Amino acid sequence: MANYILSLDQGTTSSRAILFTREGDIKQIAQKEFTQIYPQPGWVEHNANEIFDTQSYVMRECLQFAGVDASDVAAIGITNQRETTVVWDKKTGAPIHNAIVWQDRRTAGFCDELKAKGLADVIRQKTGLVIDAYFSGTKVRWILDNVPGAREKADKGELLFGTIDSWLIWNLTKGAVHVTDESNASRTLLFNINTGAWDDELLAIIGVPAAMLPRVSKSSEVVGEIHPEFLGKALPIAGNAGDQQAATYGNACLKEGMAKNTYGTGCFMLMNTGKAPRPSNNNLLTTMAWATPSGRYFALEGSVFIAGAVVQWLRDGLGIIQSAPEVEQLALSVPDNGGVFLVPAFAGLGAPHWDQYARGAMVGITRGATKAHIARAALESIALQTLDIMDCMQKDAGIKLDTLRADGGATRNNLLMQFQADVLGVPVERPMVTETTALGAAYLAGLAVGFWKSEEEIAAMWQLDRRFEPNMAQSDRDKLLHDWQRAVARSKAWIEA
């Protein structure tokens, strides 16, 4: 009997493979960063071949470092940066353009055209999404319109589109399987979350031929096998979900009303709303959570584009710190932000503002401001953006959160977690296993092959590492929020369309 599940966690800045035990513990992690490509301001690309090469490399390295043979792996689960778009040649398997990343803003003008045509309501009703350059559909259209001959080839069925999960599965199966799951499909602007299928009207609006699209599977389902050349054995690919949905599952937010926030490159709060889509009146997204044999589940989501990436900027852009972990000690060297607020709208503002033309702003700077105040303001911006979303989520769901589960790399920062609890006014729980994105993909894969028997078994494995209790006076919280909202207002509509 196999003893492990292997998760492939394809993120925005690195590809990782994580081996999980039957108890849901981490046996081994392998990670490799890849190149970020910025052709011009507001554009972000990845080399799709480099993504696959790094992912297949860490997949092998993970098992090698663990001393585990592929025959001891029951299944593979995949989770991925969502919305990032690849278009490739069906015959050769070669991408016709770099992958356009979820952060990329080049299609903002086309999104404005769709809004001007009065299409926002029909798109929201069918997809649960807002019209924004964030989502995959407009990125596909851009590639077809800007790569010579691409649209003609797409119309003939010679090109394929996929989010990163589709691209990985296509390559791992040597072109035998072209598939995505409902959670990833629901992030394209092309998928009707009510019918659970690609939508002809949406395809016509965006301008994407149906022949390019992958089959849509459940999130927990055997969709194919990886080719034996990769690990020496054909293993079932049995779980697949976008990173934030996978993190919600991995954090065992399996009951209606439970919520988690993932602190990664961006920040993403999801609340499980059960088996019915919950429309948002506060500029949040209604999205698929996952589809399993027990049914189709939905979530409310608030997406923050820049969270952990602001710490990368402190390191790589400003040189304030040499490594990401240093930011906590630097920020702790001052008692507060000194009146400095940083709005990291480097790629516009996501929920609940949805301002494609906002840009980063730092306000409240005096001669007494230091790099420590800037570091503290950067960390606080992550928590304050999360507060904006939680307020909207509680209104939409009609549920007052009593606890927020947190995951992702930045949760290791105790200052950030405590400040988050302080400004939210509710406890923040950090799980023992913070790699919940990969864990969620593992759970979905394990369920599909009987490695785990039920969601009740999975929920019982969740373990608390630390609970951060709120410890801030309401008056202080109100003042912070007031000044934060003033700072956000100054970042909006900075680019003149």
Swiss-Prot record:
Binding-site residues for glycerol, renumbered to this chain: 82-83, 134, 243-244
Secretion signal span: none
Annotated metabolic or biological route of this protein: Polyol metabolism; glycerol degradation via glycerol kinase pathway; sn-glycerol 3-phosphate from glycerol: step 1/1
Biological process according to GO: glycerol catabolic process; glycerol metabolic process; glycerol-3-phosphate metabolic process
UniProt binding sites for ATP: 12-14, 265, 308, 312, 409
Reaction(s) catalysed (UniProt annotation): glycerol + ATP = sn-glycerol 3-phosphate + ADP + H(+)
Keywords: ATP-binding, Glycerol metabolism, Kinase, Nucleotide-binding, Transferase
Principal EC category: transferase
Activity-regulation annotation: Inhibited by fructose 1,6-bisphosphate (FBP).
Domain of life: Bacteria
Transferase recorded as keyword: yes
GO MF, one example: glycerol kinase activity
Entries under InterPro entries matching the protein: ATPase_NBD, Carb_kinase_FGGY, Carb_kinase_FGGY_CS, FGGY_C, FGGY_N, Glycerol_kin
Recorded family membership: Belongs to the FGGY kinase family.
Function per UniProt: Key enzyme in the regulation of glycerol uptake and metabolism. Catalyzes the phosphorylation of glycerol to yield sn-glycerol 3-phosphate.
Name of this protein: Glycerol kinase
Name of the encoding gene: glpK
